[in-house]
């Protein structure tokens, strides 16, 4: 795959994912610059060698795109805008960390981020910048325009909501920085997923494309769910023997109906406290499906069912597959799922199916692990309905 093609196509994928949360241009900019260092004569010589290959990673290519962006930012009319500089730093870290995250400040107080932004010699950076602009058919004015548009997205999609959160909750400064780190992880996740997905496509791994068009998945799943529940209700009524069994059945039905009706409320964090055997799995699934089905396609990315133990995850997955009527819509992800095929392993790390059943440990890895395969999944949580079973 040609480098220019990779940058453009990975950028298009990032744009489509980023647009779902209002940062399409911002995400595109990260991808268009992430491998800019590969335009260098040094890297091209390295990649084309057949014998005596240097050790993998010996030629740094991940810093150049960030340095190029920072250089153009310093020469732009926006170089004195504090929030714009914050955005450029977020993008720059995303680019420099796309092969592995690192601490910006080490234990000795050294600024490692600044070190990463001063790796490429000026002469080599000028060469890379010239080739990047030529091959990408970009002008400096076009890049400046993209930065300006990305800044607008950053303000609308992140800074304004963050300001609202801080005002409503009287959030301390340290918490504000935590939200900043979440934004950084989101950008890095979009970059890793877009990079890996495009590379997989170029290698012919069609299974790693977006697994399915979700336009009607949730509507179909909800219809199947309702038919499944009607079937269970009919079977149950035929087998009810005692008054106590009838009461339990009616309570379960009422709980499920109330959960379905609750889907009309706005987005938020809600708790469903019920005793064992009350039908939480199917009741919460009904709520999630109705929320997803009534929203526009772009507004609900996935439904997640998070369980504390593998055994519960396995049981819940089987229940959910039967309820939605199509196994291809449901992915089960935990350490007991054995995929010897490398392609299937990649699919597992991507979390692209409409409904994901996984364990709390995999969920926490996605939130906090330093491994790229976990970071990759992070952006899939955006605009999703997340059900946490037996949250501790």
PLM regions and their residue ranges:
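SF2 helicase catalytic motif II
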Residues: 361-363, 374-392
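Inter-Walker segment of RecA-like/P-loop motor cores
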Residues: 326-368
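Accessory nucleic-acid engagement/destabilization modules that flank
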Residues: 3-228
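Pre-Walker A (Motif I) flank of P-loop NTPase domains
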Residues: 265-272, 301-302, 352-354
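Conserved Walker A/P-loop ATP-binding site and its immediately adjacent core
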Residues: 283, 288, 299-324, 337
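The Walker A (P-loop) glycine that initiates the GxxxxGKT/S ATP-binding motif of P-loop NTPases
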Residues: 274, 335, 390
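Walker A/P-loop
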Residues: 265-289
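Conserved pre-motif I regulatory segment
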Residues: 234-273
């Amino acid at each position: 795959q040609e480098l220019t093609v990779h940058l453009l196509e990975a950028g298009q994928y990032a744009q489509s994912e980023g647009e779902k949360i209002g940062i399409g241009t911002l995400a595109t900019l990260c991808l268009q610059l992430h491998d800019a260092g590969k335009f260098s004569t040094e890297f091209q010589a390295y990649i084309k060698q057949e014998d005596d290959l240097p050790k993998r990673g010996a030629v740094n290519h991940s810093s150049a795109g960030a340095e190029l962006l920072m250089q153009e930012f310093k020469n732009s009319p926006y170089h004195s805008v504090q929030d714009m500089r914050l955005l450029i730093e977020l993008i720059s870290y995303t680019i420099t960390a796309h092969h592995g995250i690192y601490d910006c400040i080490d234990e000795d107080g050294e600024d490692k981020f600044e070190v990463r932004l001063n790796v490429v010699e000026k002469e080599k950076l000028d060469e890379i910048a010239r080739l990047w602009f030529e091959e990408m058919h970009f002008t400096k004015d076009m890049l400046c325009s993209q930065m300006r548009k990305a800044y607008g997205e950053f303000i609308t999609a992140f800074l304004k909501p963050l300001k609202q959160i801080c005002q409503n909750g009287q959030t301390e400064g340290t918490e504000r920085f935590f939200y900043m780190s979440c934004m950084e992880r989101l950008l890095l996740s979009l970059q890793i997923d877009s990079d890996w997905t495009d590379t997989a496509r170029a290698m012919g791994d069609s299974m790693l494309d977006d697994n399915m068009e979700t336009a009607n998945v949730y509507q179909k799943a909800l219809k199947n769910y309702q038919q499944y529940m009607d079937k269970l209700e009919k079977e149950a009524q035929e087998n009810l023997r005692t008054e106590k069994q009838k009461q339990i059945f009616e309570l379960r039905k009422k709980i499920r109906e109330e959960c379905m009706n609750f889907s009309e409320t706005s987005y938020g964090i809600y708790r469903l406290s019920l005793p064992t055997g009350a039908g939480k799995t199917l009741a919460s699934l009904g709520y999630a499906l109705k929320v997803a089905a009534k929203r526009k396609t772009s507004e609900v990315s996935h439904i997640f069912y998070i369980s504390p133990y593998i055994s519960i995850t396995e049981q819940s997955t089987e229940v959910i597959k039967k309820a939605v009527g199509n196994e291809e819509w449901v992915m089960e992800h935990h350490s007991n799922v054995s995929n010897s095929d490398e392609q299937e392993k990649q699919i597992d790390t991507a979390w692209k199916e409409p409904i994901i059943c996984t364990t709390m440990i995999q969920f926490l890895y996605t939130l906090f692990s330093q491994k790229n395969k976990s970071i990759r999944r992070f952006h899939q949580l955006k605009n999703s309905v997340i059900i946490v079973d037996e949250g501790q």
